[in-house]
């Protein structure tokens, strides 16, 4: 899609990067609970159409007045979460569940998990490259979503880890994308 190409170019150009901030400006902070809500809302109708349930975990246990955040622009966190959620919805089976989980509050650790086929260990580095698509999937896409996510994570020094969401299920281990500051 053209919109994903443009998003990748913006991410690669460093537009709105930390170095572009005014020297005396306060560092940006992206509220994780708020951005989760916005990102889930952005993919809700597609998930509904495909029979996918989206669950959010970890926010119900937040202390009063707690607002865990990542040191980054809110729009960048939204782009990361939207891309991860779009992939999770796209690859999950009908009737499946996608889970967004705030696994740790301080420092924040955020996970997006699905029940799809997962990504074999040997392909995990390659799927972060632009235009790379795994063979053998019947899911349409451009191969740009995870490249955009990786580029933005690198810019804001977020560590992105891909692992099996359900390693005990060899047929459909799912994918868990974990975000935390490096």
Where are these regions (language model features)?
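Short conserved segments within the C-terminal catalytic ATPase subdomain
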Residues: 22-23, 46-61
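Short beta-strand/loop element within the Bergerat-fold HATPase_c
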Residues: 95-107
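Short conserved segment of the HATPase_c
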Residues: 119-131
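Short alpha-helical Gxxx[C/S/T] motif in the catalytic ATP-binding
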Residues: 145, 149
